[in-house]
Swiss-Prot record:
InterPro entries: Chorion. It comes from Bombyx mori. This protein is one of many from the eggshell of the silk moth. This is Chorion class CA protein ERA.5. The gene is ERA.5. The keyword Signal applies. Residues 104-119 are annotated as: Right arm. GO terms for molecular function: structural constituent of egg chorion. GO terms for biological process: chorion-containing eggshell formation. The keyword Acetylation does not apply.
Amino acid sequence: MSTYTFVLFCLQICLIQNVYSQCLGRVGPGGPPVGPYGGPLGGPGYGPVGYGGCGGYGGSGIGNVAVAGELPVAGSSAVMGQVPVIGAVEFAGPACAVGSVSISGACGPTCGCGGSPYY
C-alpha cells in the first residue's frame, strides 16, 4: 500500500467517525440503560474523570458570526434537508431592509432530546 493510499484511508476513517459520532444524544451508544457507563470511554471532559457520564463532544456548540458593513444582498435562499445548526439571528442598529426572516428547527428523533419544533 502506498503512502498516499494510506493517508486517504486514514482521512476516510476520520470522516466516517465524525459523521457517525454526532447525534448519539445523552444516552450514549448502548441505549438508555447502559448509556452513562459509556461516557467515560470518550475521555475526560472536565477534570480528572468523565463529565457527568458524557463524552468529550456531543455534536453541539456555540458559535458567533459577526458581519459589519454594507451588505447589498438580493434574492432568496432555501435550505432543505438536515442542517446541523442551532442558533439565533440578531439585528442591531439601523437596517433599511424589506423582506422577512424565518428560522425554524427541531431536534431529530435520534438526538435524544425529544424537543418539538420551535419557530
